[in-house]
């Protein structure tokens, strides 16, 4: 931990222009990114009386060991570069509004030949379009159940679809008209596509259009005396209206707007956003983040009234949230375009609604409101009405959003008090039990997984402050200690330990020594800046899954590499014994110990991650095809071949000319495929 005075820039060396700056720690990781109208004025604040800094800012300046900056032409450029660097370096002291993966959503797998609609909770995936998020899982399932009456698109998994395709008869949903049964050819690919388009159109907010079309069809059926069809359309309209009733009309003028509000205390901030489309609330989400305190606040900032940090929080949220949303939408659009090009048809003609709405209603005007508006308008490609509602329905809705933010912060604090106390107690107990100099703020654990020596893999999981840091997880295929159906768990532990800490040494050496003391902005520093070198610093505690033999193997690697500042232990599964290097007897923690509970949690997470990877590798090996080893034949072309001929067996019956007729195959590649499938006897 460095004293800020040791890396303070020399007087007069900091420019007075607008710019963006980075603080780095002694491992050269970027730990904070900020922007300023005047770099000299802003950076000087960090090196004044540190006792006057916000607690989190004070922690940051002591964790840092150098500072760099880049001068830009305007405040708008500074705002954009700050967003880019936060995305690139993921600094731990910046406010980050990450997508909450626990929110339930309704998803449509647009990348499949016959897209399906399904309930989903988790990180976003390629080739899938998402609607929501919803506040409750039952709301997603009920909405889907009602809508497939009107839009009977596929909802089954790939396995169920293939099974019924082979059986030649549909599932129950096909018999009760809640699925158009594309698996048995009841509808063509194009007809199913039209159903999906209607579903996506409705979920995108074009509800009036769908209602008008159904009403017109119902009236036409009635006039033609087709009362059975008219009754079915009437029931479909009832289902549509039931879905719409659940999305209460809050703004009667058909407004498309996002409403955003914060609730804060001294250390944290909760933000809620309501998405209103066509006057109805279509989605809601929220985050709780730590405040950085890195803002120029007025001298009377402790006075009663609104939190003076709110404008800064609002600015950061708007730029980060909509920047991420536009980037994600562009990625999804590119995937759709690739799919359209590959299939040769325009599968989804319905226009996707703008990610940045026409109107953004905020609790307070953001800091540098004009610059923020310009950034949002660039993201939208059109004007954005960014304002604080003063009266009427919009003001009432803002108060509702503020109330939700306050409730979210309250519930978070209640939960956090319990969680933080338990984690702190567990880390303290581990420190005392293992006689460590400090509590292990970073813990790493490795585990081996295999079945009778096949597909031998290892996992490395990371916990920081007692919580999993999944972005730092690593997976390894064991190379030296396994093969030919044999596996040595002890040697495998040694191999993983060696590879992990060799990576540590390599990442530490990635930055030349002459740049270690850089406190200015120049081209060399920028060229050597690297994205998150997460293994450039060691853990305080390294856990291996196993007993004394595994610990001894890892300790040999430590001795070989000269690692002396990492505590090494083994956690044996059967009796939950903790083994230390060289000790004849294990450490036994009480069964109700918070320390043991945390160590078990880390070990079990490593086991889960290893098992998952092992299953993936085993499944991959079992899916090996005769086409896999053909030179010049990648995954896309293999898929195209099997799709065209139906199976490898039918492909084997094809001639070179037949193969050359497949899209993307020339005579030379077709000949290679033919020869690979017909080897000389």
From Swiss-Prot:
SUPFAM superfamilies: C-terminal UvrC-binding domain of UvrB, GIY-YIG endonuclease, RuvA domain 2-like. Disulfide bonds: none annotated. The keyword DNA repair applies. CDD domains: GIY-YIG_UvrC_Cho. InterPro entries: GIY-YIG_endonuc, GIY-YIG_endonuc_sf, GIY-YIG_UvrC_Cho, Hlx-hairpin-Hlx_DNA-bd_motif, RuvA_2-like, UVR_dom, UVR_dom_sf, UvrABC_protein_C. One of its GO terms (cellular component) is cytoplasm. Gene3D superfamilies: 5' to 3' exonuclease, C-terminal subdomain, GIY-YIG endonuclease, UVR domain, UvrC, RNAse H endonuclease domain. Interacts with UvrB in an incision complex. Belongs to the UvrC family. This is UvrABC system protein C. The gene is uvrC.
């Amino acid at each position: 931990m460095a004293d800020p005075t040791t890396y303070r820039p020399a007087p007069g060396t900091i420019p007075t222009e607008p710019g963006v700056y980075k603080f780095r720690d002694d491992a050269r990781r970027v730990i904070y990114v900020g922007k300023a109208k005047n770099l000299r004025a802003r950076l000087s604040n960090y090196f004044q009386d540190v006792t006057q800094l916000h607690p989190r800012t004070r922690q940051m300046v002591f964790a840092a060991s150098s500072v760099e900056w880049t001068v830009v032409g305007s405040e708008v450029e500074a705002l954009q570069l700050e967003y880019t660097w936060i995305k690139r370096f993921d600094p731990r002291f910046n406010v980050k509004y990450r997508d909450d993966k626990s929110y339930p959503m309704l998803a449509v797998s647009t990348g499949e030949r016959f897209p399906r609609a399904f309930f989903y909770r988790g990180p976003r995936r390629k080739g899938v379009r998402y609607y929501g998020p919803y506040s409750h899982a039952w709301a997603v399932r009920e909405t889907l159940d009602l809508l497939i009456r009107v839009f009977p698109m596929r909802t089954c998994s790939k396995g169920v679809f293939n099974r019924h395709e082979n059986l030649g008869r549909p599932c129950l949903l096909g018999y009760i008209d809640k699925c158009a049964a594309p698996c048995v050819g009841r509808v063509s690919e194009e007809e199913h596509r039209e159903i999906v388009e209607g579903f996506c159109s409705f979920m995108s907010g074009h509800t009036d259009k769908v209602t008008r079309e159904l009403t017109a069809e119902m009236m036409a059926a009635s006039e033609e005396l087709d009362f059975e069809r008219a009754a079915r359309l009437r029931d479909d309209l009832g289902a549509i209206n039931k879905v719409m009733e659940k999305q209460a009309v809050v703004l009667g003028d058909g407004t498309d707007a996002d409403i955003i509000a914060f609730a804060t205390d001294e250390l944290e901030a909760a933000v809620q956003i309501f998405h209103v489309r066509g006057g109805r609330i279509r989605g809601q989400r929220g985050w709780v983040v730590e405040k950085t305190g890195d803002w120029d606040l007025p001298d009377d900032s402790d006075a009663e009234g609104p939190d003076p940090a709110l404008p800064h929080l609002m600015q950061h949220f708007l730029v980060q949230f909509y920047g991420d949303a536009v980037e994600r939408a562009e990625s999804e659009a590119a995937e759709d375009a690739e799919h359209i090009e590959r299939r040769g048809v325009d599968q989804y003609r319905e226009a996707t609604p703008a990610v940045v709405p026409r109107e953004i209603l905020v609790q307070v005007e953001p800091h540098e409101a004009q610059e923020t508006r310009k950034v949002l308008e660039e993201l939208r490609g059109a004007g954005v009405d960014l304002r604080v509602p003063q009266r009427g329905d919009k003001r009432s809705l803002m108060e509702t959003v503020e109330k939700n933010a306050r409730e979210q912060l309250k519930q978070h604090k209640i939960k956090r008090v319990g969680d933080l106390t338990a984690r702190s107690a567990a880390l303290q107990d581990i420190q005392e039990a293992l006689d460590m100099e400090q509590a292990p703020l970073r813990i790493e654990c490795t585990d081996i997984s295999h079945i009778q020596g096949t597909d031998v893999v290892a996992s490395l999981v990371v916990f920081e402050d007692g919580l999993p840091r999944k972005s730092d997880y690593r997976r390894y295929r064991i190379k030296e200690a396994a093969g030919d159906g044999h596996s040595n768990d002890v040697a495998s532990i040694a191999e993983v330990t060696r590879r992990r800490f060799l990576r540590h040494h390599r990442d530490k050496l990635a930055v030349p020594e002459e740049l270690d003391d850089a406190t200015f902005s120049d081209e060399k520093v920028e060229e050597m800046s690297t994205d998150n070198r997460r293994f450039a610093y060691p853990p305080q505690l390294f856990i291996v899954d196993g007993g004394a033999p595994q610990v001894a193997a890892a300790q040999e690697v430590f001795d070989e590499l000269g690692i002396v500042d990492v505590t090494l232990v083994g956690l044996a599964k059967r009796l939950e014994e903790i083994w230390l290097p060289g000790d004849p007897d294990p450490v036994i923690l009480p069964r109700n110990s918070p320390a043991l509970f945390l160590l078990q949690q880390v070990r079990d997470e490593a086991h889960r991650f290893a098992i998952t990877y092992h299953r993936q590798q085993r499944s991959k090996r079992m899916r090996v095809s005769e086409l896999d080893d053909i030179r010049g034949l990648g995954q896309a072309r293999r898929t195209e071949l099997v799709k065209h001929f139906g199976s490898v067996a039918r492909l084997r019956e094809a001639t070179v000319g037949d193969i050359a007729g497949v899209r993307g195959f020339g005579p030379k590649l077709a000949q290679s495929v033919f020869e690979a499938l017909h080897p000389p006897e």
